[in-house]
Amino acid sequence: ILPKSGMKAFIPDFGRIVALMQFNMYHWFTVDEHTIQCLKVLSEIEKLPKNYGTAVEEIFSRKSLNRKILYLSILFHDIGKGLENDHSIEGEKIATKLCKRFTLQDSERKKVSWLVRNHLMMSDFAQKRDLSDQKTIIDFQGQVQDRETLDLLFILTVCDIKGVSSDAWLSLIHI
């Protein structure tokens, strides 16, 4: 992983989130440090997916998992913070622009942008909706649409939550 100064030089939009504090009870880290923590979590998962549960291990056993999309969506998931509007919407715009710098297929660029915009969806559904209500599941399925997107969103959500703090991860796995 690039040091923060290298990240800012490589991706100027990253400069806005360097040392940007998050004033809530969940985040232990500044936005840039949280992003780096999320990337570290993904690296840990790749080495030992079984340590993160059966679902994670199953997803990583599939050869079809597009790690390029996963790494870029984690790198960009909070890049819209520090702007006036919703960070997910702003992040999607920035990710769409930045993805043009990488050798990605159009479908990959769209997937990264979608994941950045919707990176909070799974945790929001899990924490704010009744998971025993069939309508909740149908609503979620309608937004996610396919297995690849579900897998990517699930891993992004795990990395995002574990990258917030150990306590956030522990409280979530006990839901």
Go through the PLM ranges and name each one:
Residues 1-88, 97, 103:
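Acidic/His-rich, divalent-metal-binding segments that scaffold phosphate/diphosphate chemistry
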Residues 88-95, 109, 113:
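Amphipathic alpha-helical segments in well-structured domains
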Residues 20-21, 25-28, 50-65, 104-171:
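Histidine/acidic-rich helix-loop-helix segments that form or flank divalent-metal centers
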Residues 173-175:
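Conserved small/polar residues in nucleotide/adenosyl-binding loops
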